[in-house]
Structures are given as structure tokens and as C-alpha cells.
Amino acid sequence: MYARFFALVSLFAFAMYLLVVSDNLLTLYIGWEIMGLCSYLLIGFWYGKESARKAGIKAFITTRIGDVFMLLGLAALYSLTGSLGFKEILSNHAVLDVLATSVSPVFGLSWAGLIGLLLFIGTVGKSAQFPLHVWLPDAMEGPTPVSAMIHAATMVSAGVYMVIRFFPLISAGWVPGEALTPTMSVMAFIGAFTALFAATIAMAQNDVKRVLAYSTISQLGYMVAALGIGAYTAAAFHLATHAFFKALLFLGSGSVIHGMEHGLMHTGETLDPQD
């Protein structure tokens, strides 16, 4: 059991490192998918428990919906530019200008806007934004260190990180101080709505880890909303600062649950330690 747990946690961390250090979208996507696999295996770690099995499958299927659209965005970007390298695309103003001015056949969006929107749908799944947020509260079925990792260091952070990394492409054609592009408007609306509705749901929860889960969804909504209005520096800052306190909150909640369970063995009271 311990060997399986630490092997999966190490692979999870490796996938996030691969995503962060990659210099092209292909290796980023490989790390992205390895994380999706590890989340399924770790959320369903207690596979003898039916609720844990169902939570793992739910997380895997929900995030795959976003990943399909992200893969379409990668394919469109490669077919138009012939490259998936960050330097070749994001540092090349000529390429960005062509993508921002050429019109795609979908809703009259520019190719930069369409590709940005497809990549953002991947983030909606990975970073648990509305309407693909449903997997994250159930991810509490995994061991507490896994919850802390998913909510702070890996998984949900990956989606926001990817949008920050690709902000020059997503915001191509936008001039600060002027009207937002359609893709940025969608990001701002989804982020703001998610931030409000998840915080409202959190107030009605009585399970300590579910309160923290909805809190994470809300905070990620703030980050996405900031990216939608062009404040990517603020989003990156909030992503880094949020990770520290949310990891500590989850580890602290796990310690409280563990301690109360030991106390209940002596008192015999029928109190839910997570309540």
C-alpha cells in the first residue's frame, strides 16, 4: 500500500515538473495527461470503497472532456504555425499578428481567439471551473496528502499555469485599455461566476474537506477572472500564494480528522470527525 502510494505521488509530482519545465506544447500535454492518470489512481486509492472508485472515475472522465478540446487546439495551432514550441510561437510577433488577424470558420473568431478558447476549455476541466467543476469536491475521497497536492501544487494549478504561459496567444490582438477579445471575455465571465457560486456553495457545507474544496474552486475562479481582464501578473501571484495556505489547510484538516477518530475510539460518541 505504501509503495503504491509513494510511487503514484512521485509520478504525480514528476508530471507537474514536466509540465512546468517543458518548452513546447507537446511535452506540456504529456505531463498534463500523466497528471490526469495519477489523479484517477490517487483519488480512487482506497479502491475497496465504492465512493472512492466512483470519485476517481468521475475526475478522470470530467477532465478528459476538457482535454479533448485542448488537443483540438494543439492540432489547430500546429497546422497553422508548423510548430508547438513556445519560443517559435509566443516570442514571434509576426506569427501572433497573423493568428490574430486571420478569421476562423467558428463564430467569426480569429484563429488566435479560437485556439485560445480551445486551450482554455482544457483549463476549465483541469482547474475545475464551471461547468466542469463537479469532480473536485468528490476528489476528497483520496488520502489527505493527495488532496493537498491536487489543490495546491499540481492538477488544478496546471490549468491556470498553462493559461498564464500562453497569455500572449490568448490575448493576441488585444490592446490594454480597450475592449476585451471574445476569448478573454469568456474567461472573465466564467472565472467571476465560478468564484461567486463556489464560495456560496462552500457556506452550506458541513464537511471540512468539502468546504476547502469549494474554496479552492472559488480561488481558481478569481485567478481565471484576473487572466480574463488581462491581469496575468496578479493571477500568477495569487496562484503562488494560494498554494501555501491551501496545502497547510488540507494537511491541518487531515490531522484534525485523524486526531478526532482516535478520540472517538475512547469516548464511543457517534460524531463524524469530518463534520
Region annotations inferred by a language model:
Residues 1-275:
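...captures the hydrophobic TM-helix bundle architecture rather than a specific catalytic motif
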